[in-house]
């Protein structure tokens, strides 16, 4: 499949190794719970998990190629300094820059992003996503 990398250059990427296994835990427990939620709506779609961001070492939690939707799940380390994850405040700030690069890459490739924080998993529903993001899943 053709994508633009983070620099805007077109590249080919084989998506087959990243096709979602709905029953396998990859990543955090929260990520698995989000995956199980989307399974009921997306089981017949082309979905990749832990998909590489071309031109970087970053990955996207989920990409629905059928609907052009990316889903990112975030733990508390995403918006709060956690010494175990970040080691220092500089690394914490760098994580924001990486997120910006990732979201720019997703936009460059025509994907809409859904961000779900740990404390929002309990609220997950088709209606909640429509209300919060304006997206039909």
Model-predicted segments: where are they?
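Nucleic-acid endo/exonuclease domains
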Residues: 1-137
